């Protein structure tokens, strides 16, 4: 049997014709008496519901016809015979945000009401109390709920009519219906459920934090957060969890299972949260924004770590030395200093590292990769930190200043080394002779005295040197270059140290004093030679006869006696 619905699409403002079922005269005549009676009852019942909701402001003609027992068939123009079209729009009423909150805060169990939420729960007890008050503002809110619901679900005509209780099945077969009207509390509850709002009679509240749950089992699981109870234990590592789902996820660490696969690149993950975070690499999405500086992040954990820069919070503390860190991963890496653990090993040379980032940096030695490029001069670097230090050559920036003398440096390591001049600290000690040095580079050069290693060769004459600076100084003999000039006598030198020593002739300065006899010297080497008088040390030994001397010049003179 045909049915006609006017109009056939959902308009911005929906009228009675959008939700009512109409029949032509021919269609109406084909209904038997039971079907006509059922139609009358359903239409009148729905009219009663709409009136109880405070939606209708005038009685439609079709309702008057049904009440008077007239036939409500439709004429050819598409308008019900004698129908009065002066209905107010069912959904023309708009509720302000304040009105909505005023009503809904009396009904909703947990949180502010939001039409877009998948689930919103209203307490039936509270609902019935509001219904009993015949609150017009409450009815107004229900109207707006239905308007939003219809727009979001895109219901059309008779489909929405079904949700209001217009039983289109009446034209298929007659059925017996109860003569009694549905209680108002049930009418409201059914309406809310049809609109995607769940009503519940009972809920479960946490006494500790006030959070509300729909099931007692959910509350029990939640309360383990407060009690610290962990019932589910991993058989592999004995780690315990408060929920079985957390244990299931953890087991993937041991099994290596990675069920979540990225559709873009095929990479697999053990946890869905890891996959979601990874996918933001492809989309470029960075939904987590720092309120302090505006910097954005792909994950909430990255934002939390970053915010500690602003707060200065360092919650992760080393039990060994008390040093604190802002990130757990930094503490784990730091612990390896105490344990000596170096779990990341280079497959090329076998060298091991405390962190994977340091291993990645080390790999560039083998690959020759230099991904960091200076925009000023084009020089490339293996490490980002090296690029930053290099750029200070162009900018002249020297951010590290000595508090003792004010001298500034472009690198923190240079400042640390410089400060040893003031403190006299010499932390690098030679295992062979016990001599100590302020800088490790000086110790490395010194070691070559014992090993005899001279890795730096002069390309002009082939002479070898134990240090790079030594060969550079030597090359100036071949070039004749003497860039260091005395302002007093114009004498020039190929080493800055030679100029400094020379200038003491003019100034008379003798900064090196013997602690035994008080004699002073212009050069540290002269003081060292002098000290052998007091100590009796004779380090220069003749290979021919075994005689020893305190000075190398004395050995040279002696060796001539054997020639």
Curated annotation (Swiss-Prot):
The keyword Zinc-finger applies. Its main location: nucleus. It holds the Pfam family KRAB. CDD domains: KRAB_A-box. It comes from the Eukaryota. The keyword Repeat applies. One of its GO terms (molecular function) is zinc ion binding. GO terms for biological process: regulation of transcription by RNA polymerase II. It is found in: Nucleus. A zinc finger (C2H2-type) spans 204-226, 232-254, 260-282, 288-310, 316-338, 344-366, 372-394, 400-422, 428-450, 456-478, 484-506, 512-534, 540-562. GO terms for cellular component: nucleus. PROSITE patterns: KRAB (PS50805), ZINC_FINGER_C2H2_1 (PS00028), ZINC_FINGER_C2H2_2 (PS50157). Keywords: DNA-binding, Metal-binding, Nucleus, Repeat, Transcription, Transcription regulation, Zinc, Zinc-finger. Residues 14-85 form the KRAB domain. May be involved in transcriptional regulation. Belongs to the krueppel C2H2-type zinc-finger protein family. This is Zinc finger protein 879. It comes from Homo sapiens (Human).
């Amino acid at each position: 049997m045909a049915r006609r619905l006017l109009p056939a699409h959902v308009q911005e403002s929906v009228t009675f014709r959008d939700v009512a079922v109409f029949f032509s005269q021919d269609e109406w005549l084909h209904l038997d008496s039971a079907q006509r009676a059922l139609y009358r009852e359903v239409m009148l019942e729905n009219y009663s519901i709409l009136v109880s909701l405070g939606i209708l402001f005038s009685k439609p003609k079709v309702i008057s016809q049904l009440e008077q027992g007239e036939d409500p068939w439709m004429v050819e123009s598409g308008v019900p015979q004698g129908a009065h079209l002066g209905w107010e729009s069912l959904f023309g009423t708009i509720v302000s945000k304040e009105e909505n909150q005023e009503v809904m805060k009396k009904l909703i169990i947990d949180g502010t009401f939001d039409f877009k939420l998948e689930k919103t729960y209203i307490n039936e007890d509270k609902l019935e109390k509001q219904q009993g008050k015949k609150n017009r503002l409450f009815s107004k809110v229900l109207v707006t709920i239905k308007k939003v619901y219809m727009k979001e679900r895109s219901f059309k005509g008779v489909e929405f009519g079904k949700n209001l209780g217009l039983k289109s099945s009446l034209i298929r077969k007659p059925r017996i219906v109860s003569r009694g009207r549905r209680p108002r509390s049930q009418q409201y509850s059914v309406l809310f459920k049809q609109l995607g709002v769940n009503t519940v009679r009972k809920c479960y509240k946490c006494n500790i934090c006030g959070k509300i749950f729909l099931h007692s089992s959910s509350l029990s699981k939640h309360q383990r957060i407060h009690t610290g109870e962990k019932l589910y234990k991993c058989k592999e590592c004995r780690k315990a969890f408060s929920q079985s789902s957390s244990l299931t996820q953890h087991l993937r660490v041991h099994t290596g299972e990675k069920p979540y696969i990225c559709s873009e690149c095929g990479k697999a993950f053990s946890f869905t949260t890891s996959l979601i975070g990874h996918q933001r690499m492809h989309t470029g999405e960075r939904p987590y924004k720092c309120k302090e500086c505006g910097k954005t992040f792909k994950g909430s954990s990255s934002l939390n770590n970053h915010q500690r820069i602003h707060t200065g919070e360092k919650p992760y503390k080393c039990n060994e030395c008390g040093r604190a860190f802002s990130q757990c991963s930094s503490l784990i890496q730091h612990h390896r200093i105490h344990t000596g653990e170096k779990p990341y090993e280079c497959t090329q040379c076998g060298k091991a590292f405390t962190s994977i980032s340091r291993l990645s940096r080390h790999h560039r030695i083998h690959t020759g990769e230099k991904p960091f490029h200076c925009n000023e001069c084009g020089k490339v670097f293996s490490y980002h930190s090296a690029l930053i230090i290099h750029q200070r050559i162009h900018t002249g920036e020297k951010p590290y200043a000595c508090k003792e003398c004010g001298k500034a440096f472009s690198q923190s390591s240079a400042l640390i080394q410089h400060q040893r001049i003031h403190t006299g600290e010499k932390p690098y000690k030679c295992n062979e002779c016990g001599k100590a040095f302020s800088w490790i580079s000086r110790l490395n050069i010194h070691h070559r005295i014992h090993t005899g290693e001279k890795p730096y060769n002069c390309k002009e004459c082939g002479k070898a040197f134990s240090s790079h600076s030594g060969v550079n100084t030597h090359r100036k003999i071949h070039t004749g270059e003497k860039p260091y000039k005395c302002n007093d006598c114009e004498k020039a030198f190929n080493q800055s140290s030679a100029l400094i020593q020379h200038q003491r002739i003019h100034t008379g300065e003798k900064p090196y004093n013997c602690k035994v006899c008080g004699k002073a010297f212009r050069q540290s080497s002269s003081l060292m030679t002098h000290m052998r008088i007091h100590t009796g040390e004779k380090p220069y030994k003749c290979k021919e006869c075994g005689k020893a001397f305190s000075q190398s010049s004395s050995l040279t003179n002696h060796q001539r006696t054997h020639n």
